[in-house]
């Protein structure tokens, strides 16, 4: 469990945790963190329930609700993950550059598609529900 005295400062085992992304799904608030790449669900009051670490990620940079699921973009590998019933499913590494720190910087839903912006390549990727593991690159 994580305790928050204010919206922007939380502690977990005595160390500060920064929340870097958030999304609401089924009336519940989910947040991603830095520096441990974890996802928490708001449990009421000052309490957050830890859902776990997303792979070996360090920061949850972006989150979006798409097709009834929570999608997660990360640093340092620019990976996209999906939250499936409390379990994280790896989907794709988007930024294939040789930079040591790659990230899915932003996510948004528009026109029935999920979009993801990346750094340092500066590319925007999109996918559509019902398509099998495809990411269009712009």
Q: Which residues make up each language-model segment?
A:
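Trp- and S/T/G-rich repeat-edge/linker motifs of beta-rich repeat architectures
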Residues: 1-20, 24-28, 34-61, 65-69, ...
